[in-house]
């Protein structure tokens, strides 16, 4: 699942690693010193965070019972607070719990050169549960950790409750059919039908009018052509009559010319016959 390896160098804890080891530090008293998860060097008596829940050498059983009762009460309070939290905060607190538990394991990890400690099998669930219980602060000595996500004993139960609350089915309302809407639908359908009928009739009438106009144009064109033909024929006949009249006039003039010629010849012959008789007398 998760593999936690202690880094070779820790930047934010450099002032602890650069100094001397814990065993070589001088202290005014001979009591046993221990190191908590916040890297605070304290005496055997603990007053904050997880230190109150750790076992003391030579402690009494009554104190352990009171501590367990305080843990249960703090867990109940934390559960009630977590129910009111949104899902995003639960996710962030879950990640914070994982990081803090990993820091606790780093404190307990072996020194440099040892093998990497792996959390596999049945141990991860127990270690994480113990880590959550140890990090839970008492209600009297709350330093900000009691209300955090480290006091969650079973994340599955909390996540199940929150998801059940958030994923409630939305109420679906079935639309009721009103008679007014039906009447309006019927009226709209009838109106659409009437509009379509009127449009079709108007289109048909327009087509008929266009056809009539075309027919009238064709008739007018035919009549115009016939009138033009008749006018042309009349003009031709008039020309023919004029030609005939001209021919008749020419014929008459020719006849008069012939008559005049005959008379002239006659007069000429009659005058030639008279002249020799006079000479003979």
From Swiss-Prot:
Belongs to the UPF0500 family. Keywords: Coiled coil. Residues 45-74 have a biased composition (Basic and acidic residues). This is UPF0500 protein C1orf216 homolog. Residues 198-257 form a coiled coil. It comes from the Eukaryota. Residues 179-190 have a biased composition (Acidic residues). The lineage of its organism: Eukaryota, Metazoa, Chordata, Craniata, Vertebrata. Residues 1-197 are annotated as: Disordered. InterPro entries: DUF4653 (IPR027812). Residues 92-102, 147-161, 169-178 have a biased composition (Low complexity). Pfam families: DUF4653 (PF15546). Residues 1-12 have a biased composition (Polar residues).
């Amino acid at each position: 699942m998760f593999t936690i390896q202690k880094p070779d160098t820790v930047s934010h804890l450099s002032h602890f690693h650069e100094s001397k080891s814990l065993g070589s530090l001088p202290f005014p008293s001979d009591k046993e010193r221990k190191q908590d998860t916040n890297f605070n060097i304290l005496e055997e008596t603990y007053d904050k965070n997880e230190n109150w829940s750790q076992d003391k050498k030579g402690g009494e059983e009554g104190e352990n019972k009171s501590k367990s009762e305080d843990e249960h009460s703090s867990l109940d309070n934390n559960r009630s607070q977590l129910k009111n939290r949104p899902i995003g905060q639960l996710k962030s607190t879950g990640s914070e719990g994982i990081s803090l538990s990993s820091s606790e394991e780093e404190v307990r990890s072996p020194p440099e050169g040892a093998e990497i400690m792996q959390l596999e099998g049945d141990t991860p669930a127990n270690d994480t549960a113990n880590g959550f219980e140890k990090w839970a602060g008492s209600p009297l000595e709350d330093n900000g950790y009691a209300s955090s996500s480290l006091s969650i004993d079973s994340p599955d139960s909390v996540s199940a409750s929150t998801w059940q609350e958030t994923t409630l089915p939305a109420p679906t309302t079935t639309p009721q059919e009103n008679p007014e809407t039906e009447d309006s639908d019927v009226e709209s359908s009838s109106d659409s039908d009437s509009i379509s009928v009127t449009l079709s009739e108007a289109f048909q009438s327009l087509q008929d009018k266009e056809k009539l106009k075309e027919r009238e144009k064709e008739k007018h064109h035919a009549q115009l052509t016939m009138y033009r033909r008749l006018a042309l024929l009349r003009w031709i006949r008039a020309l023919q009559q004029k030609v005939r009249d001209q021919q008749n006039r020419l014929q008459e003039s020719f006849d008069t010319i012939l008559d005049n010629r005959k008379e002239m010849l006659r007069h000429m012959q009659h005058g030639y016959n008279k002249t020799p008789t006079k000479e003979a007398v």
